[in-house]
Amino acid sequence: MALTGYASPAWTGQHDASIRQSQGHLALAVGRIKGVLPLLHTPAWALHGDLHGDLVTQKAVLAEAIQLPHSTKVLDLGPRAHAGLKPPKSWTEVRRHTRQVPLPSEGDVHLPKTRDKQARRFVREGGLVAVESGHENMAWSHVERLHAASRDRKGLSSHQRRLTPLLQRLAAEPWTFAVTSTNAEGEVVASGGFVLLPCGTCVYAFGGQERSKDSGRASVAMLGEAMRAAQRMGANTFDFGGSQDSGVDKFYAEFGGVPVAMWRWVKAPFWFKWMFPKTWSAWTEPSRVLDMGA
């Protein structure tokens, strides 16, 4: 049977270290901190990954990752991690979150009233929203461009050298699709790349927008159309991918996205937090959203 979702070889990169067992999968990559310290980590595209199965299965997959020789590890377990999982002693456990909305099995996908008005206004003013799948690399080129631009604005690395070939491979897969929003002037101002997982979840994996007067409404229209496309393809849950940015998280919440816990396990030498305080802080900053019940 062909591997789909995050278990697919389409995700494999030059430094891929993913663990694949018959009952489970954990996406991993190998890198270096400051070009020196070896790092085993969950790739940025798989923070809301595909760890699944019962407790015994998940323990077996994680045990294999834990035993790998890297002194520094950052493992993101995703929203389907079993509640009974516990990190090894000396590891740091961090609670983060994504947001999800259920999709109806039939009938229309309804957006909250304010979001629906914004999407309709974008189209009424000449905007066009298109869903493309298969070998439509033009749509995915917009996903790449706007994803990188959005991360650059936030001061985050876009990993362009690895992102470009990755999106080219994903564009050819039947379990992915891209959505673009084009304004009345013919400019693509918002786009997203989406991944359908075997569990029935559709993940907003890549995306971004231009800074313009209509980019906000364009993004709303793009996500609304993505939710409808996911429903047509058999998805029962739409996952916004999670964001630690409070503004972005609020944007997802206004779509009706409900917070779902995701756990991160971090292992590092005892001196790491003093040598690399900013990196340690970024890795271990917890989500407060679940505490607030937002």
What are these regions (language model features)?
Residues 1-36, 79-101, 106-214:
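A conserved beta-strand-loop-helix scaffold within acyl/acetyltransferase catalytic domains
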Residues 33-36, 83-108, 232-294:
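Active-site/acyl-donor-binding loops of N-acyltransferases
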Residues 61-64, 165-167, 173-277:
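Aromatic (often tryptophan-rich) hydrophobic motifs at membrane interfaces
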Residues 53-54, 99-101, 124-125, 155-158, ...:
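Glycine-rich loops and low-complexity Gly/Arg-rich segments
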Residues 34-44:
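Conserved acyl-donor/pantetheine-binding loop and adjacent beta-alpha core of acyl/acetyltransferases
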Residues 15-17, 68-72, 176, 232-235:
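Short, high-confidence coil segments that cap the C-terminus of an alpha-helix
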Residues 44-84:
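A gly/proline- and charged-residue-enriched helix-loop-helix capping module
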Residues 57, 139, 247-248:
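Short phosphate-engaging motifs
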